[in-house]
């Protein structure tokens, strides 16, 4: 491979929640490990790979100039987004006026809700649910109504369209948060599924907020379908949210963007987000995006997805062979695996907290699935060198799931 996905990079002391906050965030971060075990971060949804070199190059080049005053986004910022969406997702007709900066995807979610629904109103979200949705939507004063995903006979997560229709009607819902690809389940929705969901949302006159931050992390054999692309109605009722941060490991720089084709929808969302001035772009974040969306970025992401596919295959095969009673749906996108430990816990007289504590004790920091509405689940991040995935599996086998 052209890029390095094998080096183990020390992140200690370099502003990383994933490695430096163990034992410091009760109920969220893993406990500190026992002496003799180093930390393998498999919880926070960022990667343990160096980003594409052009990101650093563009940031350093701009940082060498000694002034960082007020600025407007460069035309190149919009050009790079348009080209990226065209080449990666087949998007047509995207223009600079359709694109707007968002200081984080969750900020875009809340701004859209504030533009269209009142505090106390219900919002439809699929469960299992990304914890960021839960915290942000509830903190903003809205009531979440969950429509649970269902596993089919092949172990694939599916939307329950009848349940969606029932919940929308019973709760008089007119705003939906849709996650595509889905976090934490790793489902890459097919076109006909999105079409049917969007038709239901049309019938109930819903504004759709489509979080597509994972849209570049797609495993072989699958393809991301932008929600706005399935129909003209979907194009006009959807606020789509993207970011290079998940793709290129840039969460600490912050820098998401929306795509809104409907002028009225766009004006209302921007009016809300602009009132507090929270949505001002950071100049280095702009240059990071421009650096990421260079030709090298396309190559880097393609290699990344190959690496992630290998990691996921290794991990899932290991679970099948060694962790009897643990089940999962093999992800089609993202770098997360959502483990269902219900049967294992029943058979061994343990609970999910024991698994979390014992994993952390030996330096495997995976994430509690309960806040994601997985009652006996663990979310595992596999975006790290394969050697670390292997080491984590070995420790979990010897000291946790098959400890003697």
Functional labels for PLM-detected ranges:
Residues 68-199, 216-217, 221-229, 233, ...:
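Conserved core of the PLP fold type I
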Residues 125, 146, 210, 366-368:
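Hydrophobic residues in well-ordered beta-strands that form the structural core
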Residues 2-104, 111, 295, 403-404:
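N-terminal small-domain helix-loop-helix segment of the aminotransferase-like
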Residues 237-321, 327-331:
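PLP-dependent aminotransferase class I/II
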Residues 308-309, 322-361, 378:
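Conserved PLP-binding catalytic core of the aspartate aminotransferase-like
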Residues 142, 203-206, 235-236:
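A short helix->loop->beta-strand "cap" motif at the edges of active sites that frequently abuts
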Residues 347-350, 357-404:
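PLP-dependent enzyme catalytic core of the Aspartate aminotransferase-like
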């Amino acid at each position: 491979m052209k890029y390095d996905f094998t080096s183990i990079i020390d992140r200690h002391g370099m502003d990383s929640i994933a490695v430096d906050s163990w034992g410091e965030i009760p109920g969220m971060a893993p406990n500190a490990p026992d002496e003799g075990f180093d930390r393998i971060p498999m919880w926070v949804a960022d990667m343990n790979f160096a980003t594409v070199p052009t990101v650093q190059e563009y940031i350093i080049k701009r940082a060498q100039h000694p002034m960082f005053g007020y600025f407007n986004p460069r035309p190149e910022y919009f050009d790079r987004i348009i080209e990226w969406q065209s080449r990666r997702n087949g998007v047509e007709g995207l223009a600079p006026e359709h694109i707007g900066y968002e200081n984080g995807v969750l900020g875009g979610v809340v701004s859209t809700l504030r533009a269209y629904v009142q505090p106390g109103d219900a919002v439809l979200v699929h469960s299992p649910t990304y914890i960021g949705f839960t915290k942000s939507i509830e903190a903003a004063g809205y009531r979440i109504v969950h429509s649970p995903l269902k596993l089919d006979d092949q172990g694939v997560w599916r939307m329950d369209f009848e349940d969606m229709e029932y919940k929308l009607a019973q709760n008089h819902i007119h705003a939906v948060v849709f996650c595509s690809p889905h976090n934490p389940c790793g489902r890459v929705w097919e076109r006909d599924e999105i079409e049917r969901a969007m038709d239901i949302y049309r019938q109930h006159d819903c504004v759709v907020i489509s979080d597509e931050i994972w849209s570049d992390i797609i495993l072989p054999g699958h393809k991301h379908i932008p929600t706005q692309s399935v129909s003209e109605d979907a194009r006009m009722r959807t606020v789509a949210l993207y970011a290079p941060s998940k793709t290129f490991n840039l969460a600490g720089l912050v820098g998401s963007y929306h795509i809104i084709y409907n002028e009225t929808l766009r004006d209302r969302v921007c009016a809300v987000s602009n009132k507090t001035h929270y949505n001002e772009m950071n100049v280095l974040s702009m240059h990071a995006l421009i650096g990421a969306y260079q030709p090298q970025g396309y190559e880097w992401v393609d290699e990344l997805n190959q690496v992630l596919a290998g990691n996921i295959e290794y991990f899932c095969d290991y679970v099948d062979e060694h962790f009897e009673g643990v089940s999962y749906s093999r992800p089609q996108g993202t770098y997360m695996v959502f483990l269902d430990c219900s049967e294992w816990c029943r058979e061994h007289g343990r609970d999910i907290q024991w698994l979390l504590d014992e994993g952390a004790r030996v330096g495997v920091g995976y994430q509690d699935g309960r806040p994601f509405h997985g009652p006996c689940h663990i979310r595992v991040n596999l975006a790290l060198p394969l050697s670390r995935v292997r080491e984590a599996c070995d420790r979990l086998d010897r000291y946790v799931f098959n400890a003697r």
